[in-house]
């Protein structure tokens, strides 16, 4: 089963605009559908293709890259001979799948693109890419596209639903509530998406009517794969990325979700673990959210990287991690989450899905922690804005509520302290759309529209 993915249109743009002058690199975590997408695109948009899967190719294929790059006529002659087909020039594509496993193929892109006979699509897991490029020249002829797990709309498409998202978009655009019945139905579907997640294998199992035990088993295998790859990186670089990754659910259970190194090692300090944290975030299996010391438009200039939160890249994987040691069956636990009856801290799941949706929408993730003395108080208290983004050249603060709770003290004190001119102020919560007191309240499923 091949799912419809939004990034397909970006590949079309690359093909048209590049005109063979760059290769495209699909970057992302393992098991998010990069290889499937590349193959589907090759079948649909070219007359012919060759797939080089470097997890399977033998040394004969690899030796072509090592021995024939100085003579590209010989390179293609030997490649076509070993693959049993000849490609039409200017009408065909060659896929370098899992290129991280054979960095010399990636380095060859510079010469192959300059040659101009064929287009090239590369796919790679960022965990392995980052550790395997130390000794090669990264080609400037690469156009990189970041790919993420399936978002809510893609999940709806996979379920055969082309109706729901246009309704959500219309409500958001017109700033009108959907109505209780429609909102309740969409929230149930969205909770199902949170539970299943956006990993294509898990979504496929769900659309086939498989039990949640089976879906959870698939996701556990993906988590094990991530942890084993991180462990390999740790062994080679004397880092603790695998430990950092494993503690994410426990970190998010903290009252304010801030990352505490004491949960990794009681004597741990940021400076000793900064590379491991960066590796988890840059590998796109985790989403880092950084504190800014001032709510200014150039948020990155005020980033305090030692004060951060770390979310999982896919909320469905977080759900599986949370439920790992639960006494109940996965079937019962998943249904409890879908029907909003789960006894565990749902706030961490909801905050994680909002972080994921904002990241997929193209935002870097920041939050703001500040001290303020409210009127009538004799001492400063600490407050926090969950997320801060920039829209229309103005700061846009975002608060996330795991229920219908509408308190907005943090917004009020933020405006009071900094005399801030904001774009919009959003509270993302579990109820229907509404506007009140200068604040826009949007349901969880609209977070990706910001």
Functional labels for PLM-detected ranges:
Residues 2-18:
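Pre-Walker A adenine-sensing motif
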Residues 15-22, 29-31, 40, 44-47, ...:
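A cross-kingdom feature that marks ATP-driven nucleic-acid transaction machinery
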Residues 34:
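Conserved lysine of the Walker
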Residues 43-61:
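Conserved catalytic segments around the Walker B and adjacent sensor/switch elements
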Residues 56-89:
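Short glycine-rich substrate-engagement loop in P-loop NTPases that contacts/grips substrate
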Residues 95, 119-125, 146, 155:
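Structural recognition of the conserved hydrophobic beta-strand(s) that form the central parallel beta-sheet
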Residues 111, 128-144, 156-161:
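Short regulatory helix/loop adjacent to the ATP-binding pocket of P-loop NTPases
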Residues 162-350:
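Interdomain hinge/linker elements that couple catalytic modules in large macromolecular machines
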């Amino acid at each position: 089963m091949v799912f419809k993915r939004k990034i397909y249109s970006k590949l079309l743009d690359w093909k048209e605009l590049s005109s063979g002058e760059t290769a495209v690199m699909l970057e992302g975590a393992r098991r998010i559908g990069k290889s499937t997408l590349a193959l589907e695109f090759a079948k649909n948009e070219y007359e012919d293709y060759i797939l080089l899967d470097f997890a399977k190719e033998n040394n004969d294929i690899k030796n072509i890259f090592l021995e024939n790059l100085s003579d590209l006529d010989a390179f293609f002659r030997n490649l076509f001979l070993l693959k049993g087909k000849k490609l039409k020039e200017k009408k065909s594509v060659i896929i370098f799948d899992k290129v991280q496993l054979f960095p010399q193929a990636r380095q060859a892109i510079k010469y192959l693109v300059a040659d101009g006979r064929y287009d090239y699509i590369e796919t790679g897991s960022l965990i392995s890419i980052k550790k395997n490029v130390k000794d090669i020249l990264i080609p400037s002829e690469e156009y990189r596209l970041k790919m993420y797990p399936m978002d809510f709309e893609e999940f709806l498409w996979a379920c055969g639903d082309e109706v729901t998202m246009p309704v959500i978009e219309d409500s958001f655009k017109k700033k009108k509530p959907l109505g209780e019945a429609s909102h309740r139905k969409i929230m149930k579907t969205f909770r199902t998406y949170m539970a299943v997640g956006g990993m294509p294998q898990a979504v496929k199992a769900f659309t086939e009517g498989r039990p949640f035990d089976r879906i959870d088993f698939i996701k556990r295998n993906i988590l094990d794969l991530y942890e084993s790859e991180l462990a390999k990186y740790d062994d080679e670089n004397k880092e603790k990325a695998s430990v950092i990754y494993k503690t994410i659910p426990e970190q998010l259970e903290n009252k304010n979700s801030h990352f505490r190194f004491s949960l990794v090692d009681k004597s741990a300090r940021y400076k000793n673990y900064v590379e491991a944290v960066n590796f988890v975030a840059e590998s796109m299996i985790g989403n880092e959210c950084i504190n800014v010391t001032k709510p200014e438009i150039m948020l990155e200039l005020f980033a305090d990287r030692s004060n951060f939160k770390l979310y999982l890249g896919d909320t469905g994987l977080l759900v599986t991690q949370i439920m790992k040691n639960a006494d109940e069956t996965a079937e019962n636990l998943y249904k409890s989450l879908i029907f909003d009856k789960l006894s565990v801290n749902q706030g961490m799941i909801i905050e994680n899905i909002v972080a994921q949706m904002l990241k997929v929408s193209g935002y870097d993730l920041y939050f703001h922690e500040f001290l303020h003395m409210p009127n009538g108080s004799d001492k400063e208290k600490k407050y926090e804005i969950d997320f801060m983004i920039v829209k229309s050249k103005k700061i846009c603060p975002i608060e996330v509520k795991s229920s219908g709770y509408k308190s907005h003290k943090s917004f009020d004190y933020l405006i009071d302290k900094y005399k801030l001119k904001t774009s919009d102020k959003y509270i993302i919560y579990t109820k229907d759309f509404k506007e009140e007191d200068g604040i826009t309240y949007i349901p969880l499923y609209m977070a990706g529209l910001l």
